[in-house]
């Protein structure tokens, strides 16, 4: 359930309440509560989400008994995959009625998640801990000032994150050995000012200035220095000393853009950005955009853009424990794209929309996070990357009959991402190969069929094979993650009573019981279900009518 992730509540009139209870396979429970109040001046929203599950689904382990030629592989349970996630989001907005709007947002997250045991881990005992915990508070104060031809927005905020990663194993002596005890604290203070100014109907000027102060402390309490450097306590006993990083960095960003529409059909825009990370400045980063209305019939529009890219490694990229890489280089390159879009239809009958985009990027020192054999991920630079391809999107809404509606949305992507870096050695086979974990082909379709208070949904997605080694080796089982198709369905029925609106929804995930992995050696659940009950009392509406 991701509804708490939204950053702005829907406008409310009076008091409203919504409660959703979900129950699913593997003893999975989801709960969602929303309280809202609104009038002409005030809008408030309180949202709470709690999700938990042992996540101990069964799977067939093809990575054990590899010499077996039939299908008699072990059936095992997903170990160390339990999770508990709590989210609370509070928002308050006040409108003065004279063009000023003040806002307060506070979002708290408390999460505890196990990292499942790899299917190639052959230890039989369950004395194992691989767990990540997180507590995060995000708070933002905002002010928006709106006038007929211009507007100004100001934001200031604070983000605090505490993260812990623990890895423990029983090594055969009956005792749990603490191998990793990573602790990270991140504090960020930020401010942002943005503005827009309209000059007539043809010109729009925008500007944004932002500043972030990051403070990161990341240590591993379990790392001990070498013997000749290891300190001792007053009794002469060697002590453990945490090893890690305590870093701070200020980041500044400035962006200005000019948009010009000389005719009804043609639009032009240019943007300039410059950023500072610590004591390093990026060069001026330009971007150019244009769009042209080819035909009003069907609203056929051609679009194109060219932009320069520049990205410094974040402090997490550099120093997070475990996995941070302090040797990362900054990423930079150019991106080009062009495409067509259209939208047509008949009122009350159908609407059809679609777009196709070609893109081409040349990136040096691409920063990518990759999984390691130790169970965590780490970032690396890929010296030269050529990423290009085509993305196609389409949507259709049809009124089939008086009470019948059909809608569908789909997309298809062809995204080669080729490593063109210099070989480390003359025999390096990674040059000219697809980057790891990036599928060359992917697609998805979502369809809805509605009849009065009934709603049926079908979701389908496809991912082509993803390579796990830089040379795209397919001779071994660990060289790739196999392609897979996925289908999910749901059926929802809405009920309207005098005292409340209710809906009951049943979901079947992985309808065809597909065996698949998203990450090498991490099996995913097969066919599973969820049931949701949604309740929305009408007391506010009933009182208003009375």
Regions found by a protein language model. Name each.
Residues 53-59, 364, 406, 462-471, ...:
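C-terminal beta-signal and adjacent terminal beta-strands/loops
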